[in-house]
Amino acid sequence: IDFFDREEEGKPLNFLDTTGLLTPKQLKMVESRMKAAREAAGDDVDIIMENHSYPDALGAVQLAKLAEKYNIMAFEEPNTPTTQTVEYIAKYSSVPIANGERLYSRWQYAEYFKKNLLQLAQPDIGNCGGITEVKKISDMAHAYDVGIQVHCAGSPLTTNAALHLECTLPNFLIHEHHTCNRMDTSVGLTKYNLQPENGYFTVPDLPGIGNEFLQEAIDRATLYKVIE
C-alpha cells in the first residue's frame, strides 16, 4: 500500500512534497492511513508499505518509525537505493526493507547482502538479465537469509516466468500480483491470463513458460531501434 502518494484532498504529491524531513501534518496523515489499513485488514493480514523510492533517507526513516507500530511486513523501496542511504535507514528502523527493482545485477545485490541491508529482495526478470540471472541473485540471497519476491509488474508473460522461477526457490516468500496484471491493455496481450484463486496461483505446466504473446500483440507492437 502506498500511504504517501496523495494529499488528503486526493491531489498527487510531487517530488518536493516527499523529500527532506516530512512535516508533522504529513506524518499525521500517513499514520492515519496506516492505522485505517491495519484496522480494516485485521492482525492476520500482511501489509507491505510501498514507497516507490519517493522520499529520501531522512523521510524514509520517519515513515519507518510510524510503520513499526502497525506490524508492517516490509518497507518497499523506502528511497532511491544506494548502499549508503539504505544503510542509514536500516540503522534506525526495525521494519524489514524490501528493494531491488532498481538494482540490475548480482554485483549490485552483493553489496546489499554483505551489509545486511535487505530482508526481501525484489529482482525483476525483465531488467536483471533474465531467469538465469535472477536465479543466481536469489541463490546468493539465500546464503544471507534474504527472502525473494520477484518484481512482477508487466504482462501475463512476466507472471508465468516469475511463477516458474519462484517455485524453484527455497527462499521464495510471496508472489507480486500487480494491478497492471488485471488491466485490459495487459491481459489481452497473451494467450493465457493467469489469475490467483483465493490468494494462490497454480504454476502452469504447459511447454516452455506456459504462455505466449498473441500474434495480434506482436503485429501491433511498437518497435524501438536502440543502436544502428
Regions found by a protein language model. Give the residues of each.
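Shared catalytic-loop signature of beta/alpha-barrel
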Residues: K65, N71-A74, T80-Y200, P204
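Active-site microenvironment of metallo-dependent hydrolases
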Residues: L214, I218-E228
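Metal-dependent enolase-superfamily TIM-barrel catalytic cores that perform enediolate-based chemistry
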Residues: I1-T83
